[in-house]
């Protein structure tokens, strides 16, 4: 198959000309080993999603972690409807897990709890039932706005002290904005 330059989303090395995505960010594995939560921000079309998909696959294949790249973008239309945003985000995360993780590392069906705590509850349940430490990369988190963005950030902060047994060992917010910009964007 002839390869080509891709400018429309994640690259596939079998189809597209690309640099090794994981070699571009060697410090990330160290952050994960240190149970860090971190932000990866860069302009559009610079390889963030490609790199994080490749890193998640490599970490999972190593046998040491259950690592996945998920997206928060489906929650973007709901600036103040936390319940709807959470439900759509969790549905997208379940689909991503089904397509990217082996059956033995799939999350449980996310239990329904009250709005404002669904994401934390799902991540907690997933970490507690996972046979390996859970690593989650949340792409497009900066697509969220208003009350929804604040709710997501508060839930992640609330779960942080419970890692790695009851919350992801390591978590990355991936997008175009630095974390300092999130509160401003939330209003």
Report the location of each language-model feature.
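Switch/connector loops and helix/strand junctions flanking conserved nucleotide-binding motifs
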Residues: 76-80, 179-184
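Conserved NTP-binding/hydrolysis module of P-loop NTPases
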Residues: 79-103
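Walker A/P-loop-proximal flanking segment of P-loop NTPase domains
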Residues: 1-46, 50-59, 121-126
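Conserved catalytic segments around the Walker B and adjacent sensor/switch elements
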Residues: 61-77
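The start of beta-strands in P-loop NTPase/AAA+ ATPase cores
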Residues: 36, 66, 134-135
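Alpha-helical scaffold elements adjacent to nucleotide-binding pockets in ATP/GTP-utilizing enzyme cores
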Residues: 50-55, 84-92, 151-155, 159
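Conserved Walker B catalytic segment
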Residues: 114-178, 185-186
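Active-site catalytic microenvironments for nucleophilic, acid-base chemistry
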Residues: 58, 96, 162
